[in-house]
């Protein structure tokens, strides 16, 4: 199921740096993480859905690039974000 407008607004509100911030790396990573987590049950039920799997892999790659950028430019923000999202065990 796709993110609803309300869910997306709540995620943006939770991760924004300041009021009106919708495009910062933290917000983008959070949105991608929730979309990725939302697709996981779909692939358990539909293991042969390769077309959607390609979209999932694109999202994972985009999130990886954004996290690498954050790690390189703002290490403290990166550590706080991965802890908050439960990434990197």
From Swiss-Prot:
GO-annotated biological processes: translation
Signal peptide: none
SMART domains: Ribosomal_S15
Gene Ontology cellular-component terms listed: cytosolic small ribosomal subunit
Annotated GO MF terms: rRNA binding; structural constituent of ribosome
Keywords carried by this UniProt record: Ribonucleoprotein, Ribosomal protein, RNA-binding, rRNA-binding
Subunit structure: Part of the 30S ribosomal subunit. Forms a bridge to the 50S subunit in the 70S ribosome, contacting the 23S rRNA.
NCBIfam families given in the database record: S15_bact
Name of this chain's protein: Small ribosomal subunit protein uS15
Gene source species: Neisseria gonorrhoeae (strain ATCC 700825 / FA 1090)
Encoding gene per record: rpsO
């Amino acid at each position: 199921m796709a993110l609803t407008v309300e869910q997306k607004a709540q995620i943006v509100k939770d991760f924004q740096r300041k009021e009106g911030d919708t495009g910062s790396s933290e917000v983008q990573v959070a949105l991608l993480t929730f979309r990725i987590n939302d697709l996981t049950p779909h692939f358990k039920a539909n293991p042969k859905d390769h077309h959607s799997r390609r979209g999932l892999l694109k999202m994972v790659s985009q999130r990886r690039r954004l996290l690498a950028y954050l790690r390189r430019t703002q290490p403290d923000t990166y550590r706080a974000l991965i802890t908050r999202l439960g990434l990197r065990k």
